[in-house]
Amino acid sequence: MDELPILPTTVIGSYPRPKWLREAIRLHKAGKISDEDLQEAFDDAVVTVLHDHEIAGVDVPTDGEMRRDEMVEFFAERLAGFKFYGPVRVWGTNYYRKPSVVSKVEYIKPMLVDEFLFAKSVSYTENLKITITGPYTIAEWSYNEYYKSKKDLAFDLAKVINSEMKKLVEAGAKIIQVDEPAIHTHKNEVEWAIEAVNESIKGINVKVVMHVCYGEYSYLEPYLDKLNVDQINLALKNYNYEPVKLFKKWDREIGVGVIDVHNKRIETPEEVANDLKMLLDYFKPEMIWVNPDCGLKLLPRKIAFQKLLNMVKGTKIVREELKNKGYNSTSLKPLVNR
């Protein structure tokens, strides 16, 4: 299907793991259950997540990234050139397995195709989104012990990510999201970081989204016209929508974050509807996709589900008003020739 309802609803990627999956992972690490049993638990979790998304009414779901611990670690474990020395403290008592690049980064084999095909086989819709961490974020969140510069590393990463994306398209992916939460970390690197993203999506003839969450959006604004994605996806609710004014000249699709993922307070449908009506003062209806600010994995599952449910309910309020004005659907086709 090449069309979605006006104001399509989606998720960013991650979703809370069910408690029983977390227990299965613990038991597997302790050697108490087999690899086969763990894979069955992952499969069951994906079915559960897609069921939650279906009941909530999400138009474009994901598999919740059930098989991924972290967004950089997952890919570093599956590419040549990376090594892990041990956990690094990020903040407080939170630790992260930060990878080190010790040799040339190279593509070995598909990393996401199997998980995409399984999710596709159990999904309630063919409009399933698959997410992949972008080249700049992997480079920024890794130790570089091999390349002359972070830029050189990012462009090699772009090549391997491009190889993976092409495999996903061959497998039937219709929507691919590049996650670049770090892209606006350093003002003087944004221009070439966007070039690296463009390199990673070259030749990808399906809808491509770039998700950018919390940070300095003003660093991105001067280079938006150089970005070759069909949609840019932003965290806005947590910022009280202040960054919106920076994207007034953006003329493609925009994913608007209307759910705060760092707050357990559940937004009401009316609140979501009012926020969307305000955003329609900035963007045409056919440009807007509706989503949470970021991934939902850190929230309790019941709260994450209720937030999604109310997001969809609020969107439907505005959708009905738009239908009365002649707006019915949004195209799923890519907007940019890459």
From Swiss-Prot:
Organism expressing this protein natively: Sulfurisphaera tokodaii (strain DSM 16993 / JCM 10545 / NBRC 100140 / 7) (Sulfolobus tokodaii)
Annotated residues for binding of Zn(2+): 211, 213, 294
Role this protein plays: Catalyzes the transfer of a methyl group to L-homocysteine resulting in methionine formation. The physiological methyl donor is unknown.
Family of this protein: Belongs to the archaeal MetE family.
EC number: 2.1.1.-
Pathway connected to this protein: Amino-acid biosynthesis; L-methionine biosynthesis via de novo pathway
GO MF annotation: an example: zinc ion binding
Cofactor binding remark: Binds 1 zinc ion per subunit.
Recorded superkingdom: Archaea
Keyword hit for rRNA processing: no
PANTHER family per UniProt: 5-METHYLTETRAHYDROPTEROYLTRIGLUTAMATE--HOMOCYSTEINE METHYLTRANSFERASE
Family annotation (InterPro entries): Met_Synth_C/arc, MetE_arc, UROD/MetE-like_sf
Cofactor(s) this protein requires: Zn(2+)
Keyword terms of this UniProt record: Amino-acid biosynthesis, Metal-binding, Methionine biosynthesis, Methyltransferase, Transferase, Zinc
Gene Ontology annotations of biological process type: methionine biosynthetic process; methylation
Protein name: Methionine synthase
